[in-house]
Amino acid sequence: MVKIDYKKCGYCGACVGVCEKLAINLIEHIIVIDEKKCNNCKLCTIVCPLNALEGE
């Protein structure tokens, strides 16, 4: 599962736009991952300019 390092996150939304399963949402300046929708493809970890997302 992908985890967010909120200390690194700039809340730019790059991960939201790339998620094919619509599992990532930007809600009031907080990135939220719906674990039920996430298929662990890790595209979000690739596009994050601040390396705030890590896949397990």
From Swiss-Prot:
Residues 2-28, 29-56 form the 4Fe-4S ferredoxin-type domain. InterPro entries: 4Fe4S_Fe-S-bd (IPR017896), 4Fe4S_Fe_S_CS (IPR017900). Ferredoxins are iron-sulfur proteins that transfer electrons in a wide variety of metabolic reactions. The keyword Metal-binding applies. Binds 2 [4Fe-4S] clusters. GO terms for molecular function: 4 iron, 4 sulfur cluster binding; metal ion binding; oxidoreductase activity. [4Fe-4S] cluster 1 binds at residues 9, 12, 15, 48. This is Uncharacterized ferredoxin MJ0533.
